Design a protein with these regions (language model features):
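A contiguous pocket-lining binding segment that forms or flanks enzyme active sites
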Residues: 97-123
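Acidic, glycine/proline-rich low-complexity segments that act as flexible tails and inter-domain linkers
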Residues: 1-65, 170-180
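Short alpha-helical scaffolding segments that buttress acidic/His motifs in well-ordered protein cores
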Residues: 38, 42, 52-59, 72-78, ...
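Strongly charged, low-complexity linkers/loops
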Residues: 113-138, 142
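Transmembrane-helix boundary/entry motifs in multi-pass membrane transporters
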Residues: 146-147
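Conserved alpha-helical segments that form or flank metal/cofactor-binding pockets of metalloenzymes
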Residues: 50, 65, 71-72, 77-97, ...
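C-terminal end-helix/capping segment
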Residues: 93-107, 167-180
């Protein structure tokens, strides 16, 4: 993948850049190494970064969607959008939420080891393909999730699809690939 936007160099991190992370990243991570390649790239546009991170922090930490299902959805988005950065980072988060290696591989294939995960995978695929959910999928989600949780699912899928587009377009590399 071609890197189109490099992470912002350390000597260009000013108060505006650090302000984009205020309240969203611990102080010790408000630097190029601590923020990682994705955030260090996004912060080339501090206003956009601050606006997006506020929404993203909600999706990751305050959403009504159960964290395990959130990670099932994000991994499916990352796979469908061919976003290696998103995939690698969220495999770690998924494992922390109890998904196994077999679960992760099943998500990649569009299969699941239980009915709830399978409905979430179907929802991600439908949202990605036709930008809506079929009545059948909406109803199936409703058997397990509240209206708020279904709303959070739709916004999670949309936000991570957009983030995958940005990472892929900008050429954001995994931290271990930086400099290769």
């Amino acid at each position: 993948m071609q890197v189109r936007l490099m992470p912002l160099p350390a000597d260009q991190w000013d108060d505006e850049v650090r302000g984009a992370f205020k309240g969203m990243l611990p102080r010790d991570r408000q630097n190029p190494e601590g923020a990682g390649t994705a955030l260090s790239t996004l912060v080339r546009h501090p206003d956009l970064t601050k606006a997006f991170l506020g929404f993203n922090v909600y999706l990751l930490f305050r959403s009504s969607l159960p964290p395990r299902l959130r990670e099932v959805a994000i991994l499916r988005v990352a796979h469908r959008r061919h976003c290696g950065y998103e995939w690698e980072h969220h495999v770690e988060l998924a494992e922390a939420e109890g998904l196994t290696g077999a679960d992760v591989e099943a998500i990649r294939r569009g299969a699941a080891n239980n009915e709830v995960d399978q409905v979430v995978l179907r929802a991600v695929d439908e949202l990605d393909e036709i930008s809506t959910l079929s009545d059948e999928t909406w109803a199936a989600l409703g058997e397990e999730l509240s209206d708020r949780q279904r709303m959070d699912l739709v916004f999670t899928v949309g936000a991570y699809a957009m983030l995958a587009m940005a990472f892929n377009t900008f050429g954001v590399q995994l931290e271990q690939e930086k400099g290769k």
